[in-house]
Amino acid sequence: MKLDVFAGQEKSELSMIEVARAILEERGRDNEMYFSDLVNEIQNYLGKSDAGIRHALPFFYTDLNTDGSFIPLGENKWGLRSWYAIDEIDEEIITLEEDEDGAQKRKKKRVNAFVDGDEDAIDYRDDDPEDEDFTEESAEVEYDEEDPDDEKSEVESYDSELNEIIPEDDFEEVDINEEDEEDEEDEEPVL
């Protein structure tokens, strides 16, 4: 790959974020890229080893999120913020949601160059099967208001557990005399 923006510059002096911006600018607006594809193209351009990319990957992802010129487009796709007007960003999100209502799209199997040789690595792009089972019907679960009978049964079960520990026969009856307490509060301390 040849990027005209960096003609005459030493590749070792370029940052991954600069190369990512140049790659996305060269591809154009309708060619958003998956994060893994973007990283692979950066690696090919810079000629870095797998170990070098693995080491720099967390820093690059942080820079990608904090740099104001990139925008996540969902499903781990990235584009340049300059491609979208502020009002258009919401429209893009809405159109993505409308597309999901239609026919299901077949998912492409993506190969991650970083996970192939490492059995312990986790591929975060894999969807959970639980996510696929989610439907709007399951989102509309109705919750009943608090049932006073449930509270009563909780109190009864608590009382029965207490009775197992200390039988009711062992409790002493205590009379609370509220007048005595009021009298004590009214009295002035003697000095």
From Swiss-Prot:
Pfam families: HARE-HTH
GO cellular component: DNA-directed RNA polymerase complex
GO molecular function per UniProt: DNA-directed RNA polymerase activity
Source organism superkingdom: Bacteria
Coiled coil: none
Domain HTH HARE-type: 14-83
Any one Gene Ontology BP term: DNA-templated transcription
The entry's keywords: DNA-directed RNA polymerase, Nucleotidyltransferase, Transcription, Transferase
UniProt-annotated stretches for the region Disordered: 119-191
Subunit structure: RNAP is composed of a core of 2 alpha, a beta and a beta' subunits. The core is associated with a delta subunit and one of several sigma factors.
Task performed by this protein: Participates in both the initiation and recycling phases of transcription. In the presence of the delta subunit, RNAP displays an increased specificity of transcription, a decreased affinity for nucleic acids, and an increased efficiency of RNA synthesis because of enhanced recycling.
The family this protein is said to belong to: Belongs to the RpoE family.
Protein name: Probable DNA-directed RNA polymerase subunit delta
Organism listed in the record: Streptococcus pyogenes serotype M6 (strain ATCC BAA-946 / MGAS10394)
Primary gene name: rpoE
